[in-house]
Curated annotation (Swiss-Prot):
GO MF annotation terms: N-acetyl-gamma-glutamyl-phosphate reductase activity; NAD binding; NADP+ binding
Family: Belongs to the NAGSA dehydrogenase family. Type 1 subfamily.
Organism: Bacillus cereus (strain ATCC 10987 / NRS 248)
Name of this chain's protein: N-acetyl-gamma-glutamyl-phosphate reductase
Chief place of localization: cytoplasm
Pathways per UniProt: Amino-acid biosynthesis; L-arginine biosynthesis; N(2)-acetyl-L-ornithine from L-glutamate: step 3/4
Keywords tagged on the record: Amino-acid biosynthesis, Arginine biosynthesis, Cytoplasm, NADP, Oxidoreductase
Biological process, per Gene Ontology: L-arginine biosynthetic process
Length: 345
């Protein structure tokens, strides 16, 4: 099956290229850019030399559909909302890595993203692509809203507790830390090497755009869920996310019960790995892979459960999950082309 990538020169775009070039079923028909049309991709990123030869093209839905069936949008928020109606109109399936189609309520999107929302008729067609929890919906979708990186790690950790109804609905606290690639390719003062090296920064306190995305998905599984407390930090690594979830249980529990809950929830999910009791993952252990690793603890003194969830923000948090969703759409095994062993060193 032929695919196209729009926004091919951003970090999400080049990760898609890397994965798709190794995929046994998908092949890249075309690469598209806004600012570097006419350039060979190897001139922009020399690490692709002798691997692929593609000239970056203009974005024309009528031309793209002549060769491709699926389009990956690795474009910023706002851009995807503008492009997607044209792509859907010519019969293309769209997997969008931005946040433009994640929120069902356009008012909430505008409140958190500070920009105009996509048209409601397009929003209504979008399926939120958290693969492990939305398989049946993804399978028949024409438009996938690929989840955010923080939201992916947070939701995979939180949903088993929320669905089971064993935690106090107003007790969810999520502390998240991310590598700098999650901030995108465009440099800022905060991501500048002298500012970030040997340092740690909290940002978007109480206003991160993944908050409503997480709350919306939690509410699908438990309408009693209340607003969450969510904080994000930038740490001096290139890629990787660690989310630590805290929540208070409604009744006394044993750690074995919680361990069993997670193991049973994800026993059919190839990319979610639950650590044995008392062990906890680190981002390095999933780097370069599509895995989400989790460890669970329970504090009998406070009645709080702690879940540690780690992913590679460029893989399970972006390009890897996008291809996982494309596999589902194409009727392939979810793991096709994604069985990469983590790059530990």
């Amino acid at each position: 099956m032929k695919v196209a990538i729009i926004g091919a020169t951003g970090y999400g775009g080049i990760e898609l290229i890397r994965l798709l070039e190794q995929h046994p079923y998908f092949s890249i028909a075309s690469l598209h850019s806004f600012s570097q049309v006419g350039e060979c991709i190897t001139n922009v990123y020399p690490h692709f030399q002798n691997v692929l030869v593609h000239t970056l093209q203009e974005i024309d839905a009528e031309e793209i559909v002549k060769e491709a069936e699926i389009v990956f949008l690795a474009t910023p928020a706002g851009v995807s909302a503008e492009l997607t109606p044209k792509l859907l109109a010519v019969g293309l399936k769209v997997i969008d890595l931005s946040g433009d189609f994640r929120m069902k309520d356009p008012f909430i999107y505008e409140q958190w993203y500070k920009r105009a929302a996509a048209k409601e008729e397009i929003l209504s067609k979008a399926v939120y692509g958290l693969s492990e929890w939305k398989r049946s919906e993804v399978q028949n979708a024409n438009l996938i809203a690929n989840p955010g990186c923080f939201a992916t790690a947070a939701l995979l950790a939180t949903l088993p507790l929320v669905r089971s109804g064993i935690i106090e609905e107003d007790s969810i606290i999520i502390d998240a830390k991310s590598g700098v690639s999650g901030a995108g390719k465009t440099p800022t003062t905060m991501t500048h090497f002298p500012e970030l090296y040997d340092n740690l920064r909290i940002y978007k306190v109480n206003e991160h755009q993944h908050v409503p995305e997480i709350e919306q998905m939690l509410a699908e599984w438990n309408r009693e869920t209340k607003p969450i407390t969510f904080s994000t930090h930038l740490i001096p690594i290139s890629r990787g996310i660690m989310v630590t979830l805290y929540a208070k249980v409604k009744r006394e529990m044993e750690i074995e019960q919680l361990q069993k809950l997670y193991e049973e929830t994800y026993e059919q999910s190839a990319f979610v790995r639950i650590r044995t009791q008392g062990e906890f993952p680190s981002p390095k252990e999933v780097r370069g892979s599509n895995y989400c690793d989790m460890g669970i603890a329970y504090d009998e003194r406070t009645g709080r459960v702690t879940v540690v969830s780690v992913i590679d923000n460029m893989m399970k948090g972006a390009a890897g999950q996008a291809i996982q969703n494309a596999n589902i759409i194409a009727g392939l095994e979810e793991t096709t082309g994604l069985q990469h062993m983590p790059l530990y060193l």
